[in-house]
Amino acid sequence: MGQCVTKCKNPSSTLGSKNGERESSKPHKRSSSHKDEHLSICGKASREILVNGTKKGDVSLEASQPLAAGGDTKKKEQGTGAELSSVQRIEELFWRYKDEREDAILEEGMERFCNDLYVDPTEFRVLVLAWKFQAATMCKFTRREFFEGCKAINADGIEGICARFPSLLNEAKQEDKFKDLYRFTFQFGLDSEEGQRSLHREIAIALWKLVFTQNKPLILDQWLDFLTENPSGIKGISRDTWNMFLNFTQVIGPDLSNYSEDEAWPSLFDTFVEWEMERRKNEEETKCIPCSGTDDQSTEGQT
């Protein structure tokens, strides 16, 4: 699967306000390097980006439940037995991938889990599964997250989880569900052990590309090019900027004509719109240069 993914530690948050830290300015130049970046949600990936874990002490769930007390109806006893059997299957599945020392599924187990599900750790389906499991951090499922997640999607085995993927992907297309997934993704990308409050710029680029897999905004490529070139010298993406970008894609048209700096947008959006409009202007001027030369030659031929 390639190199083990790692995290950039302690990025400085510069966004969500008008006074972010800046690096050296660079000339406007369109870049597409963000298109080659991938981020692994569970295990190893082809490009080093980000992996983190949470502190030990996560609350554990009991693997089994007591049988129904005497006096219950036969139907209730059968239902309890079926529920117990499902819990046992989830327990067996959890133990198949859990770490030898910690009561959680960690990097190696997550990679085997993804392999058995026939999914790549860098793909959208893994992010959706982490969302349904309400995973607190990348590359880790605690016992509680795994048990509650399997119950939430009504699956207790590999085949059952695989069978749920189509409906989970359809669910993620719903506007309210996608908004929840989108906001989850920001928290999911933070390093909880380091107390991060902002996403490192490169991590944010990878996560934006991933979370918009099914409903890509028309302006996304330009936004990611802007962040990759980084003319404003930003170092981190705040929660406010992350959340507001979804609103930006829904309210502002791809031609950016209805964008107003007077509205309460993060200052980074002001810089982006200015950068993008300048880029488009330069692109049009470049196209007109050969046209102008052709017209001059045509005029000389007529005379």
From Swiss-Prot:
UniProt entry keywords in alphabetical sequence: Cell membrane, Cytoplasm, Lipoprotein, Membrane, Myristate, Nucleus
Span list, region Disordered: 1-41, 62-83, 284-303
What's one GO BP annotation on this UniProt entry?
A: regulation of protein neddylation
Q: Does the keyword Membrane apply?
A: yes
Major localization listed first in the record, in broad terms: membrane
What's its job?
A: Contributes to the neddylation of all cullins by transferring NEDD8 from N-terminally acetylated NEDD8-conjugating E2s enzyme to different cullin C-terminal domain-RBX complexes. At the cell membrane, can promote and as well inhibit cullins neddylation.
* One Pfam match: Cullin_binding
Q: How does it assemble?
A: May interact (via the DCUN1 domain) with unneddylated cullins.
Quote the cellular component terms of the Gene Ontology held in the record.
Answer: cytoplasm; nucleus; perinuclear region of cytoplasm; plasma membrane
Q: Locate the lipid attachment (N-myristoyl glycine).
A: G2
Q: Report whether Coiled coil shows up as a keyword of the record.
A: no
Q: Where is the composition biased (Polar residues)?
A: 294-303
Compartment annotation = Cell membrane; Cytoplasm; Nucleus; Cytoplasm, Perinuclear region
Lineage of the native species? Eukaryota, Metazoa, Chordata, Craniata, Vertebrata
Ranges where the DCUN1 domain occurs = 85-277
Instruction: List the protein's name.
Output: DCN1-like protein 3
| Entry's free-text remark on domains | The DCUN1 domain, also known as PONY domain, mediates the interaction with different cullins.
Gene Ontology MF annotations: cullin family protein binding
